[in-house]
């Protein structure tokens, strides 16, 4: 029985997938804390789909897919900020416009050059078959993002919480927003290998949303989100070995189950908890 439980650890590709997924899940969860604070979960969705044309172009020209995805994500983020700054459109309308435009462009490129683009890898990810070069790319992305987040997390928190106060202490909201979107785009690129473009949104939203239901303190929220993101990613890869199913699907399913548990039973914000308190107060 023990040999069966330890079997996944005997394969190098499984060990690589577990370690990489854990790191990606943790860093994406860290960013998801800020998305919850600002109410920007839709931006995470937009960026996760906006990288598709960059990936498609990179595949078509035999370039590193991470390069194309990163620049597409940055372009999408800057487009959102720019259009919002020069128009009266609401943020959700701008995000929806950019998201649909970039995703449609990606599908168009794929349809025009289908043999050059591995659509399945873009949509579903391929963490179990990831090449060593891609592992190094993802490791560098995660390392740089982690260092920058640890250096600037307090500044980002102030920018997201109160831009007016941030300006009074000499911080530039525009600079830190660009920095955040750059980090988010980079992490989306890393997560593409794990769960694919369609499910990336779950990794940059669900851990933060779950933690948001459990605490009102940002530092605690971030810690809970990171733990949830890392653990579900590790366990998801492990379970997928026995299920012989899509790794990304298993990871996101686990994260969704934990969210539902928090949604129902959170001590302060859980649906059943609030209903119980309402009945007791009658």
State each model region's role.
Residues 198-249:
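Transmembrane alpha-helical segments in multi-pass inner-membrane proteins
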Residues 13-25, 63-75, 139-143, 189-203:
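Structural signature of hydrophobic alpha-helical transmembrane segments
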Residues 147-180:
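Membrane-helix/interface signature in polytopic inner-membrane proteins
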Residues 2-16, 87, 91-154, 282:
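Transmembrane helix-bundle core of multi-pass membrane transporters
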Residues 245-282:
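Cytosolic-side transmembrane-helix boundaries in multi-pass membrane proteins
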Residues 33-115, 212-223, 242-243:
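Short loop segments and helix-boundary regions at transmembrane helix junctions
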Residues 50-60, 97-109, 129-130, 173-178, ...:
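Small-residue-rich segments of transmembrane alpha-helices in multi-pass membrane proteins
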Residues 17-20, 66-72, 92, 96, ...:
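Loop-to-transmembrane alpha-helix initiation sites
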């Amino acid at each position: 029985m023990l040999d069966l439980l330890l079997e996944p650890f005997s394969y190098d590709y499984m060990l690589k997938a577990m370690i990489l997924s854990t790191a990606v899940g943790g860093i994406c969860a860290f960013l998801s804390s800020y998305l919850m604070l600002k109410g920007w979960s839709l931006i995470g969705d937009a960026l996760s789909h906006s990288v598709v044309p960059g990936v498609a172009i990179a595949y078509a020209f035999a370039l590193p897919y991470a390069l194309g995805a990163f620049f597409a994500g940055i372009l999408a983020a800057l487009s959102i900020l720019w259009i919002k700054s020069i128009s009266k459109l609401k943020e959700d309308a701008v995000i929806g416009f950019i998201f649909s435009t970039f995703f449609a462009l990606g599908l168009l490129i794929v349809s025009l050059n289908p043999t050059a683009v591995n659509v399945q890898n873009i949509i579903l990810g391929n963490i179990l078959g990831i090449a060593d070069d891609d592992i190094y790319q993802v490791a560098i992305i995660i390392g740089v993002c982690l260092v920058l987040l640890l250096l600037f997390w307090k500044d980002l928190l102030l920018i997201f919480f109160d831009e007016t106060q941030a300006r009074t202490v000499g911080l530039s909201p525009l600079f830190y927003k660009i920095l955040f979107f750059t980090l988010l785009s980079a992490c989306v690129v890393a997560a593409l290998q794990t769960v694919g473009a369609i499910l990336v949104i779950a990794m940059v939203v669900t851990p933060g949303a779950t933690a948001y239901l459990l605490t009102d303190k940002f530092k605690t929220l971030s810690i809970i989100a990171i733990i949830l993101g890392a653990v579900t990613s590790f366990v998801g890869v492990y379970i997928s070995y026995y299920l012989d199913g899509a790794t990304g699907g298993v990871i996101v399913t686990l994260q969704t189950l934990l969210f539902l548990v928090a949604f129902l039973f959170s001590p302060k914000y859980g649906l059943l908890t609030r209903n119980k308190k309402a009945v007791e107060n009658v």
